[in-house]
Amino acid sequence: KGSNYVRTMRDEIVSLISYAVGCMFGRYSLDVDGLAYAGGEWDAGKYKTVIPDRENIIPVCDDEYFSDDIVGKFVDFVCKVYGEDTLEENLRFVADALGGKGTSREVIRSYFLSDFYSDHLKTYQKRPIYWLFSSGKKNGFKALCYMHRYQPDLLARMRTDYVHEQQERYRTQLQILEDSMQSAAPSERVRLNKQIAKLKDQALEIQKYEEKIHHLADQMIEIDLDDGVKVNYAKFQDVLEKIK
């Protein structure tokens, strides 16, 4: 169409990450060409190299609260595709293309937390196939699911296995930080106070979110893929990231 846009290295890496997320959910498989699953009958035989997430719920956290969170799964994907020997080198390459400060895993975590979803919305013209459940700006709780694998019990499972679990992690972490305050030097206390304030904000945000999830989980909402993304997304608008 006469566009002079040249794809950047970041564009290429964003595409790779999108494909990796597709493999995590079973939309794509490294073992078959094209779409592996977009509704209908699930065929586990299509997945040998990367096994899709069983729950169709992948947490997106600002810290390593879950070993199977999206960063852990992405690292595993890079390892399976490109080999363990060059893993750190490849993660650094991904992080450098994305841009940002910190270790490669920190940069990748920051991307998933802040930019992945807006990139996904752009790619799919605001009709996302991966849905981001989000408690709000404090990042108290975030998790992705794949629309085509949605089941009516998804929210109930998310609430029990992930939201409650995250709340428990916050309680434990806060206790550890508050205990550390007792023996901390004045300079260290400033840092600890900051962390405590942040965690308290997140704990409050997730507490309110838990009530919203509970309300919807009890309804066991059905979706019809033929209705399209917009209609189905609207059913969960109170608990999903807003589409901008």
Residue ranges and their predicted role:
Residues 2-244:
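Terminal accessory regions of large proteins
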